[in-house]
Regions:
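Terminal amphipathic helices with adjacent charged low-complexity linkers/tails
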Residues: 159, 163-209, 213, 555-559, ...
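Conserved phosphate-binding loops in N-terminal lobes of ATP-dependent enzymes
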Residues: 6-9, 13-17, 27-28, 32-36, ...
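C-terminal, non-catalytic interaction/recognition modules in large multi-subunit enzymes and RNPs
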Residues: 4, 9, 143-154, 282, ...
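Conserved short loop/turn motifs at secondary-structure junctions
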Residues: 61-62, 161-170, 212-215, 416-421, ...
Length: 684
């Protein structure tokens, strides 16, 4: 037997899923996250799931991990002290930045500008200059450059970024400075912009490379520690890390380019959602991943997640390929509060996290959270995670009652209903960002819900968006780990090539794209993926001449082989531009960047359809419970999901429980069990 182990570390829980490839049998575990050292929670989960499966850790063939280490380093300001080497005259590139201030009309008054990840006192200039076409204008001055590097060594930097003007067109100067840095700053990790982001725009290229340096020591330490701990537990399987774009990369390479891991965790959920939605027969859908701290949403079209060229974490926005995920601070642990000034109920973004957690957990938490509201409303059973977490209903009522008192409501139930309504609206706003604001009508999509808290709110989100059916995969609380275990190895090559359509031809574009594909394929082959099992996807960034931004246009292999490449690109660009902005221009089109992603094969995981059982779900009925719905109490059936069979129809109001999550079916709706074991919720 061959086992694949998927691991996803969240803000509250660490999810582990063990998958036996030949039968599709899964074993799962959910353990509290350990923020001080994430590897502790990971190892606890692995030990637990191996014991459940009755296997030795040495039988695991692959370990596939979605991590938030890089993300947390950015959010918590725990990154390295970064030194930055720039071209003479560009020392303040990070301070000048871009003329964008968030927060509306008066944002510039109240917005606290974040400090750059590389301080000005740790930024030096070197003499030497390249032109935009890569030709040398001024040669490097070795003596001056070494003196500047020695200055950084004396400043005690922990990581070094080298970002020189126009290095995307010629990396010779950056490589030379890196060679000198290796002798002047031994042991210091070095990131050069022509490798991290070989594209135009010096600010974005510099910022992205500095971010890579900022998180590199932290990620490297974590990967080394986890690798060593796995070895000590008898797991000799290779460790792979999930990239932000949903592909896997070997741990050593991930440590070299950690900026590609900033959305590693959310990408795993989207990848898992694609797998289960395909089994249920849906390829166009929105994803809704609600955990304990935050909610991530994305859009999938034709079975492919939309990929963005910007990754945003907190105030930091870097140019890195990632699944186009939007995040809001709304989770099961989000704290409800009533500001003294406005007396208006708010929910989040503050979270009770894993420690102390919601009041219902009985770990000392006293503030009212979304989880407490669901407990008060009767939507959550008395125990979570298969009975491992008991809920304190009285503590939840006491916590939520403080909200009722603060805003003058008559009962904790009314306050709890208000908390749930507000958090649902917050998440609805995030879903609009990836659908309506991108030119898509959510009513044309299904909605795939997962995460520990997602299925509790999924039916309500379906009602708000009009996206039907709402699909709740099996084991939704560990779906991110399932995505980690069912995705493929991936690599990417990119290049800036600024050409007006009239200044290039099909042959030049085809040659450049082929070179990028060859480069990425070679790196994938080095990781053990046979060439015949590799597939390439092509993307070209286009704009009208004079525009200050580009639109990525996907290009399939058949179009690349056809003789009318520019016409195909132009037509696709016009379609996308009109969808986004509702107009076209007569300006000439212009090629800006080329990008090729090469992927290995998806794992061949067996699928076993669920046994047929007819429409009657009564064999899975465990009990009934009073739930507060539509302003009054109603009787709801409590169902054990493990006992539901294909074809069963659960009519709301109902609560469907399982080890890692709970699904709420509202009045006037019904959940049909699909043969893939997913629940399909729709209005009756």
């Amino acid at each position: 037997m061959r086992y694949r182990l998927g691991v996803d570390v969240g803000g509250t829980f660490t999810d582990v899923l063990l998958l036996e490839e030949t039968t599709g049998t899964t074993f799962r575990a959910k353990t509290p996250s350990t923020p001080a050292d994430q590897s502790i929670g990971v190892l606890n989960g692995i030990a637990k799931v191996c014991a459940e499966a009755e296997i030795e850790p040495s039988e695991i063939g692959q370990v596939l991990h979605g991590t938030t280490v890089a993300t947390n380093a950015i959010l918590q300001g725990r990154g390295a002290r970064v030194g930055l080497v720039t071209t003479d005259g560009f020392r303040q590139v990070l301070q000048i930045a871009r003329s964008f201030v968030p927060g509306g009309l008066a944002g510039w008054i109240i917005w606290p500008k974040p400090e750059p990840l590389a301080a000005l006192e740790n930024t030096v200039e070197v003499v030497g200059r390249l032109a935009a076409d890569g030709s040398e204008i001024t040669p490097l001055d070795e003596e001056q450059a070494r003196a500047q590097l020695r200055r950084l060594a004396g400043a005690g930097i922990e990581a070094l970024t080298i970002s020189l003007i126009n290095s995307y067109a010629n990396d010779a100067h950056e490589k030379q400075v890196a060679a000198w840095a290796e002798s002047e700053l031994p042991g210091i990790p070095i990131s050069i912009s022509s490798q991290v982001l070989p594209e135009m725009r010096e600010y974005e290229r510099t910022l992205t490379t500095v971010a890579n340096s900022y998180v590199q020591p932290e990620v490297s330490r974590y990967v080394r520690n986890l690798d060593r701990s796995l070895q000590e537990k008898g797991i000799t399987a290779p460790l792979s890390i999930l990239r932000s774009d949903g592909g896997l990369v070997q741990s050593a390479k991930a440590a070299e380019s950690p900026v590609s891991l900033l959305l590693s965790g959310p990408a795993g959920g989207v990848t898992g959602a694609v797998w289960f939605a395909e089994q249920a027969g849906y390829t166009d859908f929105l994803t809704f991943d609600m955990g304990g701290t935050s909610t991530d949403v994305a859009l999938v079209l034709g079975g492919e997640p939309r990929i963005g060229r910007e990754t945003k974490v907190g105030d930091l926005a870097v140019r890195a390929t990632s699944v186009d995920v939007r995040t809001v601070g709304a989770g099961g642990g989000s704290i409800a509060h009533v500001p003294e000034l406005t007396k208006a109920l708010r929910v989040g973004p503050q979270s009770a996290g894993a420690d102390p957690g919601p009041a219902a957990y009985g770990n000392g938490g006293t503030e009212p959270t979304v989880t407490d509201a669901n407990v008060v409303l009767g939507y959550l059973p008395a125990a979570l995670a298969g009975g491992e977490v008991s809920l304190d209903v009285d503590a939840s009522r006491t916590a939520v009652a403080t909200i009722a008192d603060a805003i003058g409501l008559g009962s904790p139930e009314e306050a709890a209903s208000g908390i749930v309504d507000i958090v649902n609206e917050n998440m609805f706003g995030a879903l609009r960002l990836v659908s309506v604001q991108q030119g898509y009508d959510p009513r044309d999509f299904a909605l795939v819900s997962f995460g520990g808290a997602g299925p509790l709110h999924a039916n309500a989100l379906g009602r708000l968006t009009g996206a039907w059916p709402v699909i709740v995969p099996p084991s939704p609380g560990v779906l991110c780990a399932y995505g980690d275990a069912t995705t493929c190895v991936r690599d990417e090559s990119a290049r800036t090539m600024i050409r007006a359509f009239s200044d290039t031809d099909d042959a030049e574009l085809r040659t450049a794209l082929a070179e990028l594909a060859t480069s990425a394929a070679a790196r994938l082959s080095a990781e053990g993926v046979p060439t015949e099992q590799q597939t390439a996807k092509y993307q070209v960034d286009l704009r009208y001449q004079g525009q200050g931004f580009e639109i990525p246009v996907d290009l399939d292999a058949s179009a690349l082989e056809s003789g009318d490449l520019l016409s195909t690109l132009g037509a696709a660009f016009d379609t996308e531009h009109e969808r986004l902005f509702s107009f076209l221009l007569k300006n000439e089109r212009e090629v800006i960047n080329l990008r090729v992603t090469v992927s290995g094969p998806r794992p061949d995981v067996a699928f076993q359809p669920l046994e047929e059982g007819g429409e009657d779900p009564s064999a899975a009925l465990v009990s009934t419970n009073d739930v507060w719905m539509d302003g009054e109490y109603a009787k709801a059936g409590i169902y054990d999901r493990a006992k539901l069979l294909a074809g069963n129809v659960v009519e709301g109001p109902a609560v469907i429980t399982e080890m890692d999550s709970t699904t709420l079916v509202l009045s006037g709706h019904a959940a049909t069990v699909h043969s893939s074991a997913s629940l399909l919720i729709a209005p009756r």
